[in-house]
């Protein structure tokens, strides 16, 4: 965080365009950029972007704790050659539903999920829809399990690998049991 303890800055942009972006600055502070159009009404979109701010802050906190500035904590790294990381969108969506659960089943993302539910957690096709694993994870291991997955990720793990290391002693059969209960 910046001197004085600021951890999040919110910018309301004077524009007629629709703007909603959550991230941060200089690996030190979370930031949210929104426009009036995204605030009327405030809802899961704003909560989703605030989720990205929290995700960004995970890396900032790792740096404060002495981690090297190499983008290898807090899932700051991407997967494979395209450097994509659907987990950021999946996690932000899950975080938004914590504040706006009534939108979870009415949101247009549900239709996409029903068409794509056979895909793996971090598949790019379901980057906004596949938040169900986080519900199962937190129901089984507590709400802190979500933040532990983020805080204790280790490059080049994906979320499943971090989960296996933290909760299942890297036992693949235990992972299969956990996934198919």
Feature locations, PLM:
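Short helix/loop segments within enzyme catalytic domains
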Residues: 96-116, 141-155
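Stable alpha-helical elements in mature extracytoplasmic
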Residues: 42-50, 87-91, 95, 130-133, ...
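Beta/coil-rich, acidic/histidine-enriched accessory regions frequently appended to metallopeptidases
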Residues: 157-181
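Catalytic-site signature segments of enzymes, centered on catalytic residues
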Residues: 108-131
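Soluble non-cytosolic domains of exported or imported proteins
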Residues: 37-45, 82-86, 124-128, 139-140, ...
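Juxtacatalytic substrate-recognition/specificity segment
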Residues: 1-84, 92, 102-103, 119
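Active-site rim elements
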Residues: 79-82, 117-124, 135, 148-151
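Amphipathic alpha-helical segments within well-ordered protein domains
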Residues: 134-135, 164
